[in-house]
């Protein structure tokens, strides 16, 4: 007859009760651990106080040879009492912890069953409200641990790559062990890998550009401030597709730089075209030789090249002539011409 008059509870009410019990069990576990440590602390302090009182009473009551034996017996007995009491206290609180943990696991399984029941029985709007209220907490509590594991593995891989590239040739190679456990595959990650472009698949394990900049000192920061050469005075190269940072450039060169994104491979064109300098011919030298060391223009075909006259009878006089001083006198030229005519 009791079942006829009993009222069935809604899944939302049951879920609320189960969630409250789960929070209560978690608080109880924290209280049990705190009680365990505090009980051991007070137990140790009580044993030390009792042992010190017994030692003082023994030292004042008994004579010299007897009080030594009694003191040794008290120390041995106190040690046995401390170890035995510690074992009993730890066993008691371990039993309480196991029982509370089992109740917590049962409550969590009951919660999952109720959530599945809500998905199957209630309407979409009511089920969505209940799931948004209770299911987000569990997912938010599980995802950070998985993300932290993935981030930790990625950091280990980056540390190994950095140690390999920065290592000097005279140093020994020391490689940090990387865990060989496979990363848990998810459908979202597999779908993203299927939708990746060939450039992204080829550069999925690419390493950043080396070398890494050393850490700036106080002197470097002062010089950067006065010379306007620090990171604050430079423009960042940001990809227009994935908004990834691809290094920095000087403000004067920023509008004319085109770069390819390290993450997605998109070619970011320069915002401006560089200035084109006019092509100018270099000036001509005195003997048809340009200042850049090249020969001058070729004379036309009809024009005969001018052949300079060579002196058939070079002088053997070692005295410097007038031509060496920069000018030739007319009498010397006439004398040379007459000498050539007589010989011919």
From Swiss-Prot:
GO CC aspect terms: endoplasmic reticulum membrane; endoplasmic reticulum tubular network; membrane; synapse
Molecular function as annotated in GO: zinc ion binding
Polar residues bias spans: 140-155, 312-326
Region (Disordered): 136-155, 171-192, 275-344
Sequence ranges on the Lumenal membrane side: 61-68
Coiled coil: 116-140
Zn-finger segments (C4-type): 239-264
Membrane topology: Multi-pass membrane protein
Residue stretches of biased makeup (Basic and acidic residues): 327-344
Keyword Cell wall biogenesis/degradation attributed: no
Predominant localisation class: endoplasmic reticulum
Membrane side Cytoplasmic: residue ranges: 1-39, 90-344
Transmembrane segments: 40-60, 69-89
Pfam families the UniProt entry points to: Zn_ribbon_10 (PF10058)
Keywords attached to this entry: Coiled coil, Endoplasmic reticulum, Membrane, Metal-binding, Transmembrane, Transmembrane helix, Zinc, Zinc-finger
Record flagged with keyword Coiled coil: yes
Biological process terms in GO annotation: chemical synaptic transmission; endoplasmic reticulum tubular network organization; regulation of protein localization; synapse assembly
UniProt-annotated location(s): Endoplasmic reticulum membrane
Family listed: Belongs to the lunapark family.
Function summary: Plays a role in tubular endoplasmic reticulum network formation and maintenance. May be involved in central nervous system development. Has a presynaptic role in neurotransmission. Likely to operate in synaptogenesis by regulating vesicular transport or localization. Required for correct localization of rab-3 and snb-1.
Protein name: Endoplasmic reticulum junction formation protein lunapark-1
Source organism per UniProt: Caenorhabditis briggsae
